Amino acid sequence: WYQKTISLNALLLSPLSIVWSVGNLIKKKLSKVQKIDIPVIAVGSAIIGGSGKTPSVLYICRELKKMGYIPHIISRGYGGSTTIDEVIKVKPHMDFNFVGDEALMMSNYFPTWVSKNKFHAMISAKEDGANILVLDDALQSYNVYKNISIYVYDSIQSFGNRLLVPSGPLRESVKNAIRKSQIFFLINTEVCNDLNDSHFKHILKYKIEINPEFKEKKL
């Protein structure tokens, strides 16, 4: 996926990438956007896997807390066994096999909710006292309204071979992901060859230093 040249395997898998793209389009068209009456910040990227999204979410929550907000994190709970109808407020003592390891880690610092249905989790967070929500890995969550979308870009990973799954690491095209983002977080900024791409011209690029050690007390 992250080779500079397109491999034979990627070419052979390209028909499945077309199926993925069509499925994504159908999902987007059928999604009914739901809106909650507190601000919503979505954090994500176009690629599958780690790109610095989780530490970026914690960074954003830390800054929001400094500004007087009460942020709660909404996660899908990747790797966990929660069902589509369950909404779980994550506690640090919970089993990561149930709620997902990233959600478990984030719950040590800020109130964190997991559910396959993000909007149900958003309602629960608001009822629990949140006045702003940060959605982890939510650029492709078409059924919730976002006030701001933040794209997290790892300069080392870049966009890989720029092909859709399974031929490449992209969940959607670079153009689509960038077009719906207002802020662009740059990770590993010593290598930023892609930033001359014409798709990036409208993006507010905000260079940050993400410290993995977060010392805030839980809200």
Model regions and ranges:
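A transmembrane-helix-recognition feature enriched in membrane-embedded lipid enzymes
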Residues: W1-P39
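Walker A (P-loop) phosphate-binding motif
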Residues: K28-P92, C192, K218
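A generic structural signal for alpha->beta connector loops
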Residues: D37, G68, Y109-F110, S181, ...
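Generic beta-sheet signal
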Residues: I41, P71, N131-L135, S149, ...
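Residues lining hydrophobic/aromatic ligand-binding pockets adjacent to catalytic sites
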Residues: L16, L186-L219
